[in-house]
Swiss-Prot record:
It is an enzyme of class 4 (lyase). InterPro entries: Isoprenoid_synthase_dom_sf, Terpene_cyclase-like_1_C, Terpene_cyclase_plant_C1, Terpene_synth_N, Terpene_synth_N_sf, Terpene_synthase-like, Terpene_synthase_metal-bd, Terpenoid_cyclase/PrenylTrfase. It comes from the Eukaryota. GO terms for biological process: diterpenoid biosynthetic process; hydrocarbon biosynthetic process. Transmembrane segments: none annotated. Belongs to the terpene synthase family. Keywords: Lyase, Magnesium, Metal-binding. Mg(2+) 3 binds at residue 469. It comes from Ricinus communis. Mg(2+) 1 binds at residues 316, 320. Does not produce any detectable product when tested in vitro. Probable sesquiterpene synthase. Its EC number is 4.2.3.-. This is Probable terpene synthase 4. The lineage of its organism: Eukaryota, Viridiplantae, Streptophyta, Embryophyta, Tracheophyta. The gene is TPS4.
Amino acid sequence: MANAISNPASFIGVHSPIAQIRIPRLCVAKGMPTPIAQRDIILQDQIQLENTCIRHAKALKEARLAFSKVRKDHSQNLIMIDALQRLGIDYHFQEETQDVLEGQYNKIFAAHQQHHLSDAALRFRLLRQQGYYVPASDVFSELKNREGKFKQELAADIKGLMELYEASQLSIQEENILDEAGAFSAHFLNCWTPHLCDHQTRIVSNTLKHPFHRTLARSTIKNFLHFYNFQGENEYIQTFTELAKLDFNMIQSIHRQEINQVSNWWNNLGLASELKFARDQPEKWCMWPLVGVTDPSLSWQRIELAKPVSLVYLIDDIFDLGGTPDQLTLFTEAVNRWEITATEDLPYHMKICFRALYDVTNQIAYKVYKKHQYNPIHSLKKAWARLCNAFLEEAKWFAAGKLPKADEYLNTAIVTSGVHLVLVHTFFLMGDGITDQTINLLNNDDPGIISSVATILRLWDDLGSAQDENQDGYDGSYIECYMKDFPGTSVRDARNHVISMISDTWKKLNQHCLSPNPFSGSFIRATLNGARMVPLMYDFDSNHNLPILQQNIKSLLFESVAI
């Protein structure tokens, strides 16, 4: 991992000729580069690559030297690791970071010592993020008074309050002290903001709105680059920011090429022209693998993962808009049998959709086998069958005008979110931790780490009873089912209940990410990034558009960092 991007030329521009560059449809929204400008950007990537590689290698060498010096300073090494994570360059230092945090964990239960609020909260958060279980009560109880309340003098420590709020996001179930810590820190940070300068207010507000653990790190790198420009007291920060700028631009170039390749695949597939009722947004769908699988060296894996993600959206639209109950039943049977001949009685658009699904899945299984010496076809087929069976169940409900019980709806809707299907593909494409135990968990159970992400996605989607762009179908929502189960419940109360469920599910997800864990650290990070991506994908405006997602696409793909 430390050398994941030592040869960026192996990722950028070697898979698709310039003549095949096509213009992403999503990226012509207001404020996006024009189609010609986008083509010029991709051309420029290749022209500037050699110089960027040289500068990046030099910056990485200097950053490693800075890390080796600062790691010996126990007053700074946690601050340094936090900076690396926020600047998006921590993947270069994974082994070194693990060594530092293991040392911190081993001594955390040593003789009782007084710590500053910010130090204690930062250590707790970094260890929890790394999978270590640190009892919250052991860390934060000493910050309370005799009445069991957080000490009032802590309210004067703005930095400490920010770290305390960040730490509270790592809470697990029945950890009341972290719930109290989150409420306490949020209250006083909000009290402070009217009295701070503009720059400080932006930092505090950003912490409250986008706590690090629940936010895609890559989407906030630019904010932290700006922030650290104001924090010059640690000279190693400047070294890290120089690397972060080069790293951001280099990975941006990789992602532009990946989206171009997926667009070419989608256009050549031809399904969009045959299924005009379905969504046609491959560039939007690409964002799932781009933010989930963050290791720059896993470029082909992201490209392949975008294919089943696209097919999930397409097949979802077929079940919502593109077939009769009998046709959908036959389609589901074909997926369960996994036979081309089973589609003979289906309409043409369903035949070609199944053929695309069949071919893509078999191709991915073959590539996984070549790379990791394991053939996952059984697991992939089973995941698709499970998804389509759930789609069919929902289609039958709504064709009959039936509104199921809330729990019954959610159990099925968690599957139709597509999260399990996508994360099964992610697991095998990444190839880390393929064991009998993990395979059995994926095939026969619904691992909590996956079902938690699926629950968060489904509830976020249903929170606004959101309709996706250009989609006219109706498939109910948890809120409607809940209000039917509990007559007299207002929409506001139902929404508050869903918000509470999302918060509780995040606690479950945090629990499932702690060690010991049968899944690899890289897969755990991918699942967490899926949960972090959800608010961007489902934050619809009144016109059923996604302005925040579009702004993130613009920032991540087309707005480079000045060096």
